[in-house]
């Protein structure tokens, strides 16, 4: 996980990305080099996400359990930890404590 506490010289899309009846809300951040990230919050719940691109999920605060598509093992992540999700796949996430995250699209 990067040690930066803020992103400088970026554009932010004003409209929120709201998923699962408001259980997951994020905003898209656009970087000068064309890359993008989302900064978001997931409330305590169990969800199944699909990915287009590969993703790196960096947990800023909170706690979750994650099971990647094709795996039978759950992994637990907390603040300061991260996990990668392959593109064109799915993952289950069980949020145990409200999750503050940064998602990088790889």
Curated annotation (Swiss-Prot):
Keywords, ordered alphabetically: Glycosyltransferase, Transferase
Keyword check for Glycosyltransferase: yes
CDD domains named among the record's database cross-references: cupin_PpnP-like
Enzyme class: transferase
E.C. code: 2.4.2.1, 2.4.2.2
Keyword hit for Lyase: no
GO MF term set: guanosine phosphorylase activity; purine-nucleoside phosphorylase activity; thymidine phosphorylase activity; uridine phosphorylase activity
Reactions mediated catalytically: a purine D-ribonucleoside + phosphate = a purine nucleobase + alpha-D-ribose 1-phosphate; adenosine + phosphate = alpha-D-ribose 1-phosphate + adenine; cytidine + phosphate = cytosine + alpha-D-ribose 1-phosphate; guanosine + phosphate = alpha-D-ribose 1-phosphate + guanine
GO cellular component, one term: cytosol
Annotated PANTHER family: PYRIMIDINE/PURINE NUCLEOSIDE PHOSPHORYLASE (PTHR36540), PYRIMIDINE_PURINE NUCLEOSIDE PHOSPHORYLASE (PTHR36540:SF1)
Function: Catalyzes the phosphorolysis of diverse nucleosides, yielding D-ribose 1-phosphate and the respective free bases. Can use uridine, adenosine, guanosine, cytidine, thymidine, inosine and xanthosine as substrates. Also catalyzes the reverse reactions.
Family classification: Belongs to the nucleoside phosphorylase PpnP family.
Protein name (Swiss-Prot/TrEMBL): Pyrimidine/purine nucleoside phosphorylase
Organism: Burkholderia ambifaria (strain MC40-6)
